[in-house]
């Protein structure tokens, strides 16, 4: 709930660990609802704790699961993968780091979005997919 301030979502599903989060995401697929999954282990367990080995292993497992998940998407589905900040596990200290965050958008007619100038383009793209006009940002659909 802290990511979206408990605003605009009907239900919050809890799960622990990436495997269970993927499972919960699959269960929600096809519901017609907007589903947001926060894979927080990258941040909480590996980023802030500066564990590059754990981060790398978790990323390999996550990447394999993403490949399977992509094959399950249906016509018209939209998948957006992004982050709210960087968290390089090799950097000194325990704070967030300043990398550009990835924005990967797949399905529903998404094309090559290139490098975006503003994160509000993510909101505009999701809004466009939902049929909601956004005041800020530019959709890549």
What are these regions (language model features)?
Residues 1-141:
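Feature captures the catalytic ectodomains and active-site-proximal regions of enzymes
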